[in-house]
A protein has these predicted regions:
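Conserved, well-structured core domains of diverse proteins
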Residues: 2-132, 142-146
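Conserved small/polar residues in nucleotide/adenosyl-binding loops
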Residues: 529-535
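Alpha-helical transmembrane segments of multi-pass membrane proteins
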Residues: 208-209, 230, 241-255, 281-295, ...
């Protein structure tokens, strides 16, 4: 082959790869809408879109006010949060996938939105009286509690998906059928106590998680995700099988700020998967690498899919201690994937990308200021500042960075977008936390947790490794298709006590163990979402 022919061939390959990548980026929204329940939203246009946008932005500002200056009791804060989340969920998520008629919201959705938030606002308005009633709640409170719970379940079906709802339904049925509890008692525990819907998960979600979601929205607006991908390309793109290594490194970096393994998969996979296929990796291997890497982003400090905040509440350990201790397991996870793709590349004889195709460090280093928000956040947390204060200061720094970023400057419109995205992100996580609270209280009030401990200890014969294996199986089964935050709450309520109380395992080690294997459920074949996205 002559030099001229080689040059033509190289140009054809480059053009083909660019077409694939552009096509993939154009198809991202379609892929997300097809496989990710959270991405199937209503289509609002014109004035209704603007109104909803500013309402969500105002909701996020209200959350900031409530966390920094309001002096209301915990139950009032949580009920207000859940009430608004339910109200906005019906305006964002249609009754089924594919409902794309612009500016359309059927009457029954409006009815459900109003009916769903009324019980929570009723709780706020009658807070002192309801607390004084204790377990002897009246029929009005029982009916409102049932409505509030059922509408929350419908919100979960729309915004989160069926898996966690099915799990919660099984636990509620066990309370009625397995333990013979009355309707009044179940409703009281689920709806009116601080162990149920407005329990610890919602408490953490309405405070720390909401503020960190706001931080993440503004950090994303600075373009830091693209910076991470460019850095990963420059760092390992030239190595043997470079694109797969880029997928691993970029997923780890993006995972530091991402709260969604699906979102992480699409953000990095839309760039790395076409490159992996072009280099010579089999399509199924490319998809598997991206799915495993992006899922691992949920165990990457400091955000850890927002589960780290709830772990701090449930274990009593400082948030800073948790993220420091999570560094080594996260490093080992990604090291294992990195070595796997390296050996696969050597086996297939794959080479890396050409140096001239990769981003230049001299162009990337001037953009290192994009990391300032993350650095400030981590420094404040490790220095012992409160999580709320750290998140707010990190958000302020992210806004400043966005303003001085010449390549993607923060405009007033982008500022409102950041608030809007923060509000939207609160919806699915808030709903998942509410449903997880139902699961948690059912386990507590039925005594099911004690039975699980007894069964596992008997089956394991007191052997820790067998108990760990059995607990791992439980985590993978219960964690399939469940969002990260709710996933951890379920694991901490059902599986962690097995190791802590049954096998005398260290509380933090047990919680880390069940959290990691609950996350691994995302790449278990039955849980198809995270596997289907990258191969699409």
């Amino acid at each position: 082959m002559t030099d001229a022919e080689k040059k033509v061939l190289d140009e054809e390959v480059v053009v083909e790869s660019v077409d694939v990548e552009v096509g993939t980026m154009e198809d991202v929204d379609a892929i997300m809408k097809k496989f990710d329940r959270e991405s199937n939203t209503r289509v609002w246009e014109g004035t209704p879109k603007k109104i909803l946008r500013y309402v969500l932005a105002a909701f996020m500002l209200f959350m900031v006010y409530m966390n920094l200056w309001a002096t209301w009791s915990g139950q009032i804060r949580r009920c207000l949060f859940v009430g608004f989340v339910i109200l906005f969920t019906f305006f964002i998520y249609p009754v089924k996938k594919g409902n794309v008629k612009p500016n359309s919201m059927p009457w029954y959705d409006i009815l459900l939105a109003v009916a769903g938030c009324i019980p929570y606002f009723y709780y706020v308005a009658n807070f002192k009286r309801i607390v004084a009633m204790g377990i002897a709640i009246g029929q009005t409170e029982v009916i409102l509690g049932i409505i509030g719970t059922l509408v929350l379940a419908e919100c979960c079906r729309r915004a989160v998906g069926l898996p966690i709802l099915i799990v919660a339904g099984c636990f509620v049925l066990y309370a009625f059928i397995g333990r013979g509890m009355s309707m009044d008692l179940v409703v009281y525990n689920i709806f009116y106590t601080t162990n149920g819907i407005i329990g610890t998960p919602i408490s953490v979600c309405s405070t720390y998680i909401a503020l960190f979601l706001l931080f993440g929205a503004f950090l994303e607006a600075t373009g830091v995700a693209n910076f991470f991908i460019d850095c990963a390309n420059a760092l390992v793109g030239w190595a043997s099988g470079g694109p797969a290594k880029v997928a691993v490194v970029s997923s780890a970096l993006c995972g530091m700020v991402s709260g969604s393994s699906v979102g992480n998969t699409v953000t990095t996979g839309s760039v790395t998967i076409p490159m992996m296929k072009r280099t010579g990796y089999p399509p199924e291997f490319a998809g598997a690498v991206e799915a495993a890497s992006s899922t691992g982003g949920q165990i990457m400090p400091p955000i850890m899919g927002a589960a780290a905040f709830i772990m701090a509440e449930m274990t009593g350990y400082e948030y800073a201690d948790i993220i420091v201790r999570a560094i080594l397991p996260a490093f080992l996870y990604f090291l294992g994937i990195f070595l796997g793709v390296h050996f696969k590349a050597k086996k297939l004889g794959l080479v890396g990308l050409k140096r001239e195709e990769l981003p230049k460090w001299k162009l990337l280093l001037p953009k290192i200021y994009l990391l300032l928000p993350l650095i400030v956040l981590t420094w404040m947390v490790v220095a012992g500042q409160t999580m709320a204060k750290s998140a707010i200061y990190g958000t302020i720094v992210a806004i400043v960075v966005g303003i001085i970023n010449k390549d993607d400057r923060m405009t007033p419109s982008k500022f409102v977008n950041g608030l809007e995205n923060g509000g939207k992100n609160c919806l699915s996580i808030g709903i998942a936390c509410g449903i997880a609270g139902i699961i948690s209280v059912c386990i507590t009030m039925t005594g099911l947790g004690g039975k699980l401990i007894t069964y596992v200890v008997k089956l394991s014969g007191g052997n820790l490794f067998i108990a760990l294996f059995l607990t791992m199986i439980c985590c993978i089964i219960l964690g399939m298709g469940v969002p990260t935050t709710a996933n951890y709450i379920i694991m901490a309520s059902t599986c962690a006590p097995i190791l802590i109380n049954g096998m005398s395992m260290h509380i933090l080690a047990a919680n880390m163990f069940v959290f990691y294997f609950g996350i691994v459920a995302d790449i278990t074949p039955v849980s198809y979402t995270h596997l289907t996205l990258p191969t699409s």
